[in-house]
Amino acid sequence: MMVAIYIRVSTEDQAKEGYSLEVQREYLEAFAKRVGLEIFRVYQDDGISGYSTERPALKELLKDAKGKKFDLVLVYKIDRFSRNLKDLLNLVDELLSSGVGFKSATEPFDTTTSAGKLIFQQLGSFAEFERNRIAERVFPGMVKGVQRGNWQGARYAPYGLYV
């Protein structure tokens, strides 16, 4: 069975450091080998939120799925694929309608059974919940930074902007 691996990190720091991407890649490649899956390609989105579907590698993966270039999408955890339940369900439906399966290497669910679908949806709900909690924790710090005159949104203010 031909498999596409999808890995993602949310922040530029994680993308530059590479640790999380490296861990995901190595784990998924070892998992695929252990269960006898042939890797078609690794799709990687660096420093892009899982709350958005506007991700270059994700779009390419979906295009290749429609072209039937692989049989299965393999992720480390479903929150690497999406942290928005509605988007997650739509993305997986899009894969399934193209004849492509979806599997997490670390979470046990089987979307061909009613119990498996329930577990999958619960895990998707937890991913969205965690994303919302992260936003709740980060927002007050960002407000405080603005009040102190610090630039928010990137490491440095855009060229020519003084803060």
Task: Label the model's feature ranges.
Residues M1-K144:
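Short, structured surface patches at the beginning of a domain
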Residues N132-V163:
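Coupling/hinge elements of helicase-like and P-loop NTPase modules
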